[in-house]
């Protein structure tokens, strides 16, 4: 399904394939010989999404340009099934495996890899030809690679990046307090409301 969003419609090269039940929404540009497979979602919220040539976007991947964070994928990249990319930059010849997540402001330099269920956290930069192992977490710049059980070490790098402020525009609550989910959901509801006026192009 191809959708116009905020008066912008996708531009898809004629040589590319978008599966019938994939969604391409809004200010999205897709280059030559790209394959967007079944169930994949490519959504430009309030920032554009640009996908280069010869890219493979596999089943149920989610690729999203978000508020203040456009998303760009270079040439010859593969995004695996159920992967999630939000507001990041992916340079040429990058491999993102099944179930991997890449968050806002992250940069994956040329030839890097994020293996199965790997995570590249907020504002993290992967150097060229760098690899994130299966289930491990990349965080910071310069990057550190940590296993999921290293919560305190991950938090030490992640906390100053202030995920709630960066992503939702809400400062992190005082120590020991939980995030204000009512405010976060209200912000997200307002951001997503314009989808009510989407127009189906094909």
Outline where the language-model segments fall.
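Glycine-rich hexapeptide-repeat left-handed beta-helix
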Residues: 1-9, 45, 59-60, 70-73, ...
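A glycine-rich, hydrophobic loop/mini-helix early in the fold
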Residues: 40-41, 46-76
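Extended, small-residue-rich solenoid/repeat segments and analogous flexible loops
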Residues: 1-41
